[in-house]
């Protein structure tokens, strides 16, 4: 589509010519190169989440990068030395899948997309330091992924284990828990995730669970509350107790975790997850019939995903394991069952069931005629569902406990009953006493539990960082020496990358079979690659020393620049990327490589760009960024993104007006053609009214910008443009010093959002250098004091007139002026003025009576 030049009077604002000229200047001069370490100015590290190169930039990128660039440009205007780098998160499944589909090497697809995105970024006028550009798929980068893995392996933070994992049957690879969506599907392929038992690599993120929760307090006020809440919930720290249950025929007790040890007297059976190691062990000594039933039940369980197993409205299923456990507080023998509503990775894979006070346990108890005992009087009216059982020894029949079999659990707090010495205590005192008793008897202890699980990083795909481990003939793990890094990916020629349920690297025999780095004996490389979230967990540190061939980053550079002052990106990364980055930063702190424990001091999440209320996509005819820039100009798109509303809100492209933004930019740009004064003119000689508007803007805009109220600042810039135009057209004209001063301020403000237009305005104003480094001017305090105010004149309680008066006017003078106004004369004609109250300089109140 042909580009549209706004149809307004005067000179032609040709955004295409302006873009071509300044793009060439920026490419030649690289003005946003980060100054070296000798620069003594204060520093700011501003970073946008780097993109995955799956194609050209889209409208979502356009919003995020426009906002991040505005932040970087603002701090440059404030005199800071700003680091604002860019790179590509270039490993990952989309590249591998595209390569399989096209029969090409993933490198070819990836780097072609990078070049496309890079050119679009440059066209978009983003103020990146291109000399620090990185790609996570470069061996020079992933070498340091491998180094970090080895450091963690040395400390026991990287380990292998055999366990049930999330398996994507379409992409044929494992997924971390964080990569499984709430509906049980893969966040990549959309396939329903199943469980599969594999030996995989994990990182011990759970060792850092408490620090990951507690340190969120440091981020209050600078991170979105929603993200902090999401991380707290995902880590899922629970405070309670571990309780040891002796199980018949087992030497070691079974330990369960509970947040309600006060309800132990109400535990009437135990549940173990059928796919847990504990269940397999317990059933081993059972009868042939029990073992056969268990095998069938386990197979049925494995066909379910976690969502299906956890849903509350699904009928409960389970089988008895033929074992009993001893309740440690009352000595009762309780049956042990396997039930699929319990997941193997929760706690120890076993729980005590308190059906009176947990709905899932109650549903299970009702399904299998298991006993129910109420041990907390919640002070709610007890319905026919459950009634309190007197302490007379034996439990009554289920029918008596649950009349009508309409069980409703009582999960609330209250006074304990049916609990021996705990009777009458409320929740917290009861919990304290139970834990004291358990600890004294060696049957339990205070404990914490976490929803968070260790980070599974193995992937059975090609396009990722090879794991730097080899195995000798006995299967022992051997670390690849650091001086042999990077372990490079092999060439794909002749290699079938199609997913087969195991890593395609295993088929690259020349690459896989290597001499042991210990003694030269035959050894085998680990064929898996790392989760690509490993790449992005620390990339922001590599930007500090991108060309250092001897270390991942220079600690001196980290001290100089890190942590990041402002991170900008989507809320979809709240758990995965942001949590992993926080974890890796704490690991690096413990290893002595950094002096801080949080990577991102402040976080800004932008909303989504929608079309007609729906998320944009190519398949649904989403808006094409390139076409929009062709039609309206880069600056109009950037300005529209920033002006649409608060950054965290979604933008519906059908509801905004890039053409309106283009017209405003043309109007602002055209001001420069009406200015006849020289750059050296003395500002103080200019029109005072316009100077007051200008300096009020200079004083108030920084606070708004630092609060990300970009839309408000743009609205105020528009008001300033209107005031300038009025001063030019109605006097004192384009030669006035205040007109030049205000127009230069407009150019500086627009440099944050519309850099092409701003640079051209600056040049047309006769200024040297780039407007991006002009500096935010300081407001003159004397121009911020109001010289006039609006005085309201009331007669008998009604506003009859208004006066623009000197802010320092006296009461007598104000009263005299008020009496002479037309409104007062008309309202008091034929009446007697009884009383006049003056509150100079703002109010005159006159009271009258009829003759």
From Swiss-Prot:
Cell compartments where the protein resides: Cytoplasm
One Gene Ontology cellular component: cytosol
Keyword Lyase recorded: no
EC number(s) stated in the UniProt entry for this protein: 6.1.1.4
EC class name: ligase
Short motif 'KMSKS' region, span: 615-619
Keywords assigned by UniProt, alphabetized: Aminoacyl-tRNA synthetase, ATP-binding, Cytoplasm, Ligase, Nucleotide-binding, Protein biosynthesis
GO process annotations (BP): leucyl-tRNA aminoacylation
Motif 'HIGH' region boundaries: 51-61
Alphabetized Gene3D superfamilies for the sequence: 3.10.20.590, HUPs (3.40.50.620), Isoleucyl-tRNA Synthetase, Domain 1 (1.10.730.10), Valyl/Leucyl/Isoleucyl-tRNA synthetase, editing domain (3.90.740.10)
Source organism superkingdom: Bacteria
Main location: cytoplasm
Pfam families: Anticodon_1 (PF08264), tRNA-synt_1 (PF00133), tRNA-synt_1_2 (PF13603)
Residues noted as binding ATP in the record, renumbered to the chain: 618
Record carries keyword Isomerase: no
Catalytic reaction equation(s): tRNA(Leu) + L-leucine + ATP = L-leucyl-tRNA(Leu) + AMP + diphosphate
GO function terms (MF aspect): aminoacyl-tRNA deacylase activity; ATP binding; leucine-tRNA ligase activity
Family: Belongs to the class-I aminoacyl-tRNA synthetase family.
The protein, known as: Leucine--tRNA ligase
UniProt source species: Clavibacter michiganensis subsp. michiganensis (strain NCPPB 382)
Species classification: Bacteria, Bacillati, Actinomycetota, Actinomycetes, Micrococcales
């Amino acid at each position: 589509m042909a580009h549209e030049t706004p149809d307004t009077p005067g000179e032609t604002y040709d955004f295409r010519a302006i873009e071509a000229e300044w793009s060439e200047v920026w490419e030649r001069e690289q003005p946003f190169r980060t100054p070296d370490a000798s620069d003594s100015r204060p520093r700011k590290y501003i970073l946008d989440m780097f993109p995955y190169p799956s194609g050209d930039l889209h409208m979502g990128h356009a919003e995020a990068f426009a906002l991040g660039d505005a932040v970087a440009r603002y701090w440059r205007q404030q005199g800071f030395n700003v680091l604002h780098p860019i790179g590509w998160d270039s490993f990952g499944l989309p590249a591998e899948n595209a390569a399989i589909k096209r029969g090409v090497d993933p490198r070819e697809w990836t780097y072609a997309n990078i070049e496309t995105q890079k050119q679009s970024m440059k066209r978009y006028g983003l103020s990146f330091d291109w000399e620090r550009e990185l790609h996570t798929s470069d061996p020079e980068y992933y070498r340091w992924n491998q180094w970090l893995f080895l450091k963690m392996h040395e400390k026991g933070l990287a380990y292998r284990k055999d366990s049930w994992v999330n398996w994507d049957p379409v992409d044929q690879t494992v997924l971390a828990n964080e990569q499984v969506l709430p509906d049980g599907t893969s966040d990549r392929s959309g396939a329903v995730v199943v469980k599969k038992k594999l030996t995989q690599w994990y990182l011990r993120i759970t060792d850092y669970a408490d620090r990951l929760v507690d340190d969120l307090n440091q981020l209050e006020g600078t991170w979105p509350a929603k993200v902090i809440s999401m991380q707290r919930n995902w880590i899922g720290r629970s405070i309670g107790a571990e309780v040891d249950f002796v199980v018949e025929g087992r030497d070691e007790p079974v330990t369960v975790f509970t947040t309600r040890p006060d309800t132990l007297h109400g535990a009437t059976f135990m549940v173990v997850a059928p796919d847990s190691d504990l269940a397999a062990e317990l059933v081993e000594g059972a009868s042939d019939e029990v073992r056969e039933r268990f095998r069938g039940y386990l197979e049925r369980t494995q066909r379910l995903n976690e969502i299906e197993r956890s849903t509350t409205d699904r009928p409960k299923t389970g089988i008895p394991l033929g074992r009993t456990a001893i309740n440690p507080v009352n000595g009762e023998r309780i049956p042990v069952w396997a039930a699929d509503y319990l997941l193997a990775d929760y706690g120890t894979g076993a729980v005590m069931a308190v059906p009176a006070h947990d709905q899932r346990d109650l549903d299970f108890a009702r399904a299998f005629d298991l006993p129910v005992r109420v041990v907390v009087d919640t002070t709610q009216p007890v319905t026919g569902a459950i009634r309190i059982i007197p302490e007379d020894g034996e439990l009554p029949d289920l029918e008596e406990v649950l009349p009508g079999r309409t069980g409703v659990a009582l999960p609330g707090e209250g006074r304990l009953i049916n609990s021996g010495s705990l009777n009458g205590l409320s929740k917290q005192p009861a919990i304290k006493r139970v834990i004291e008793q358990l600890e004294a008897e060696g049957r339990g202890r205070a404990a914490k539990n976490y929803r968070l699980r260790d980070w599974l990083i193995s992937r059975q795909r090609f396009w990722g960082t090879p794991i730097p481990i080899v195995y000798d003939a006995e299967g022992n793990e051997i670390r690849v020496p650091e001086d042999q890094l990077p372990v490079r990916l092999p060439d794909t020629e002749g290699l079938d990358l199609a997913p087969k349920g195991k890593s395609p690297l295993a088929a690259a025999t020349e690459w896989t079979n290597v001499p042991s780095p210990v003694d030269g004996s035959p050894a085998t490389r680990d064929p898996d690659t790392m989760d690509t979230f490993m790449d992005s967990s620390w990339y922001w540190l590599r930007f500090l020393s991108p060309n250092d061939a001897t270390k991942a980053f220079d600690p001196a550079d980290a001290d100089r620049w890190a942590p990041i002052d402002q991170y900008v990106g989507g809320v979809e990364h709240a758990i995965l990327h942001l949590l992993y980055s926080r974890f890796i930063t704490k690991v690096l702190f413990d290893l002595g490589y950094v002096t801080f424990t949080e990577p991102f001091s402040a976080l800004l999440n932008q909303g989504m760009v929608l079309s007609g209320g729906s998320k944009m996509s190519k398949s649904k005819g989403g808006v094409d960024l390139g076409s929009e820039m062709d039609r309206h100009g880069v600056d109009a798109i950037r300005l529209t993104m920033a002006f649409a509303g608060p950054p965290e809100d979604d933008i519906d492209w059908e509801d905004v007006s890039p053409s309106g933004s283009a017209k405003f930019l043309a109007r602002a740009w055209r001001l420069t053609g009406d200015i006849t004064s020289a750059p050296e003119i003395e500002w103080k000689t200019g029109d005072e009214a316009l100077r007051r508007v200008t300096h009020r803007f200079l004083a108030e805009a920084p606070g708004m910008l630092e609060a990300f109220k970009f839309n408000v600042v743009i609205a105020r810039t528009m008001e300033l443009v209107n005031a300038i135009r009025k001063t030019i057209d109605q006097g004192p004209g384009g030669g006035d010093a205040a007109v030049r001063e205000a127009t230069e301020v407009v150019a500086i403000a627009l440099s944050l959002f519309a850099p092409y237009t701003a640079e051209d305005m600056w040049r047309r104003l006769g200024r040297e250098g780039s407007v991006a480094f002009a500096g935010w001017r300081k407001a003159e305090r004397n121009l911020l004091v109001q010289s006039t105010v609006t005085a309201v004149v009331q007669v008998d309680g009604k506003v009859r007139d208004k006066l623009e008066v000197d802010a320092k006017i006296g009461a007598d003078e104000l009263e005299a002026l008020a009496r002479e106004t037309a409104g007062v004369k008309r309202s008091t004609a034929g009446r007697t003025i009884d009383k006049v109250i003056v509150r100079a300089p703002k109010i005159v109140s006159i009271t009258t009576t009829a003759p």
